């Protein structure tokens, strides 16, 4: 599973289409629960991810997953 950390669904969907991912291969990280539902998933952080309305909860879940060794690859596409 590919999880996309962006500020909204539209941006996540555009990113997924650009990578050639089809529905079912990816999910937008809209809250911290998504990280718990898909342990060890690959995470793609895209532009404006910091504007996600649930950023504090998501970042805490990312930190917890990293400490528990339940975090897949985190790729940051938000920087040029």
What does each model-identified segment do?
Residues 1-80:
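Short, flexible loop motifs at catalytic/binding sites
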